[in-house]
Amino acid sequence: MYNYLDFEKPVADLEGQILELKKLAQEQGSVEMGDEISRLEKRSADALKDIYRKLTPWQKAQIARHPDRPHCLEYIDRLFTEFTPLAGDRKFANDEALQAGFGRFNGTPVAIIGQEKGSDTKTRLKHNFGSARPEGYRKAVRIMEMADRFQLPLITFVDTAGAYPGVSAEERGQAEAIARSTAECLKLRVPVISIIIGEGGSGGAIAIAVANRVYMLEHSIYSVISPEGAASILWHDSTRAKDAASDMRITAQDLFDLKIIDGIIPEPLGGAHRGKESVIDATGDIIAASLRSMKDIDGETLKQERRQKFLEIGRNI
């Protein structure tokens, strides 16, 4: 059984009935329920298609936050070989919210950075729900500097509601760490590819997403602030998050139209959590194509194209 979102209740009810009938048929050794099960499966598939054909931005935000979506470490495990993680910022501590290291992608050495939310209570606490502290972004800068030194393409996976806003993080220079990570992205003379795999929230996201190629999963979101935060600021009412989500144009489709991202990676019907391997493999295909397209571009051109890309985003919005 999946973890169903509120708007998926019609599908949840039907799939619950299907499971009950299958269990009953197995217990009784009966094949007579096959027609009824097939009928319910068709109704369930049709209901899911109908729901996902007309998703609102707020519903997409909920899918982007789905606890069962594939997370950064799952992408790393499936797409890369010989992954060697690096720990610590050489100043204060190691931040488990931000994963970073080196590995091979289709045999090519690459640098990898990504935000990890965790998949259960224990790992979510370990990874701080994907909200990195200053030491996480300083670790990212370490990886970026080494990627540039050794001329390794950089691949980043973005999945965060935002950088950690706690007092301790502010005391250790959260704003400076985010700004430096963002600036370092702009200096790199290697190909940089960024994938928004779930939430792309605020400076916590952009700090590792200033890339030559930026892609989003079909039901991911990317914005300067969460819908709830925007609603609280604009209307002093966080319950209007649904309105804020629509007004801010946070979806992959909106951002592609605005030329902020370079492409959209399709998800299985029902979201990435219903077909993790297929969506991770599709992401790998996009990364491979992007690396091929930048293979013969010199470092200075890559750097200037990246800077120009983000300057144009600022001018055009």
Swiss-Prot record:
PROSITE patterns: COA_CT_CTER (PS50989)
One GO term (biological process): malonyl-CoA biosynthetic process
Domain of life: Bacteria
Pathway field: Lipid metabolism; malonyl-CoA biosynthesis; malonyl-CoA from acetyl-CoA: step 1/1
Residue stretches making up the CoA carboxyltransferase C-terminal domain: 40-293
Claim: Cytoplasm is one of the keywords in the record: yes
Signal sequence range: none
Location of this chain's protein in the cell: Cytoplasm
UniProt cross-references to SUPFAM superfamilies, sorted A to Z: ClpP/crotonase
Catalytic activity, reaction form: N(6)-carboxybiotinyl-L-lysyl-[protein] + acetyl-CoA = N(6)-biotinyl-L-lysyl-[protein] + malonyl-CoA
Keywords: ATP-binding, Cytoplasm, Fatty acid biosynthesis, Fatty acid metabolism, Lipid biosynthesis, Lipid metabolism, Nucleotide-binding, Transferase
GO cellular component, one term: acetyl-CoA carboxylase complex
Enzyme Commission code: 2.1.3.15
GO MF: acetyl-CoA carboxylase activity; ATP binding; carboxyl- or carbamoyltransferase activity
Function text: Component of the acetyl coenzyme A carboxylase (ACC) complex. First, biotin carboxylase catalyzes the carboxylation of biotin on its carrier protein (BCCP) and then the CO(2) group is transferred by the carboxyltransferase to acetyl-CoA to form malonyl-CoA.
Family: Belongs to the AccA family.
Quaternary data: Acetyl-CoA carboxylase is a heterohexamer composed of biotin carboxyl carrier protein (AccB), biotin carboxylase (AccC) and two subunits each of ACCase subunit alpha (AccA) and ACCase subunit beta (AccD).
UniProt name for this protein: Acetyl-coenzyme A carboxylase carboxyl transferase subunit alpha
Protein source organism: Brucella canis (strain ATCC 23365 / NCTC 10854 / RM-666)
Gene: accA
